[in-house]
């Protein structure tokens, strides 16, 4: 009923805020790896750049990271870097034709083997799973490229080292495409040797997030944390949920993860098509209840790889991901290899703003009660203060919330209760600044020390007024701790009114 009541009040003429609370993750590829392209993505709205380690060498990714940091320096804006592992997945090999793809036609026969040294043709391709012949059976399927290409298994010829398949649909097969064997028992390690090398490379490069592919259970996350070691202890792990086992074990995975990605591409192949939205809503809602960031990904604006405008369905999909509660929405091929990368980021930001406007029309008391009810018990002092800071901001029609937070926990707890206003998160820890770029509504603000609350608040208000986040007469809610600069001691809530000058504040 709360949704119905909200929707009945909607209008196309409602003015839109200039501030986008939902964060945008952009995959960087050949079209956008240059410093100039990265600067344009940052200025258009990118918050997190994703490096897909299913493709590219360490030298390539190292150059991209160097370019990202140079672009940050030139724009004066901070961007987080996410290393997305290849994971224990199966992929196709190289193609013989110089164009890098072959056309397949419905009804034709094609052989599938595991000889990755031999380039594929329209009659024979390879995949990198050595256990293929022991895992599949006649009557099963091999699904390629997020299930776009479907092959029916007609024979398993172990003595010849290949599987005979029939092509079920006209399609174009490229190199290094993901492969699924639905219904087959696939024995793959949680973390491959390549993943270990890539994660260690990420530690050396000081990346901010590891997006861990094909997480199936909590132990998979713990294994990655061990690989990160002491040197990589500040790198956060975003667990990608992309198979049925990951969905079944989601509660234990969420508990040990720093955040979650709903990787709908592979998940959509493993889960029945009509059930994908159920999985998405369940995962996002559980992340919201836990106060952990969640990214909705895959095919969000897919048509913009080739077209300057998204489909109506895609625009609605992005909006619904925001309304579901996503902290971030992600672009993949749209920005990695598409013809309209900047337009894709721009339209995604516009859709997010509109969806946030709709969300802010929801009866807040109903939302607040639901979030309180779903929170783990007992509730911490920090969460109690954070939740009532948001409730106070709503009641007083405040324009801004300021949190003083070392680890970012207080800011995430405030964000959990979904205020419709910006959250300036003041911290003296540089990695916290990067991590908060995946938290909805958070604007990280780096300072030398959290000692001296009043001066920090003055600095924040100067920044906020400069960026039109508040004005004279605005009410501002401050969340901090009596023990200044001590992590985990959030226990104080204040309300200030911005006066004639920054220093003219009323408590």
Curated annotation (Swiss-Prot):
State where substrate binds.
50, 265-266, 298
Cofactor(s) needed: Mg(2+); K(+)
**Cross-referenced InterPro entries:** Pyr_Knase, Pyrv/PenolPyrv_kinase-like_dom, Pyrv_kinase-like_dom_sf, Pyrv_Knase-like_insert_dom_sf, Pyrv_Knase_AS, Pyrv_Knase_brl, Pyrv_Knase_C, Pyrv_Knase_C_sf
Q: Which GO terms describe its biological process?
A: glycolytic process
Q: Which GO terms describe its cellular component?
A: cytoplasm
Q: Locate the residues binding ATP.
A: 52-55, 91, 177
Task: Report which reactions are catalysed by this protein.
Answer: pyruvate + ATP = phosphoenolpyruvate + ADP + H(+)
Positions contributing to K(+) binding: 52, 54, 84-85
Q: Which UniProt keywords apply?
A: ATP-binding, Glycolysis, Kinase, Magnesium, Metal-binding, Nucleotide-binding, Potassium, Pyruvate, Transferase
User: EC number(s) for this protein?
Assistant: 2.7.1.40
| Annotated pathway | Carbohydrate degradation; glycolysis; pyruvate from D-glyceraldehyde 3-phosphate: step 5/5
Determine the domain of life of the protein's source: Eukaryota
Kindly list the positions annotated as binding Mg(2+). Answer: 242, 266
Oligomeric state and partners? Homotetramer.
This protein's name: Pyruvate kinase
Q: Which gene encodes it?
A: pyk
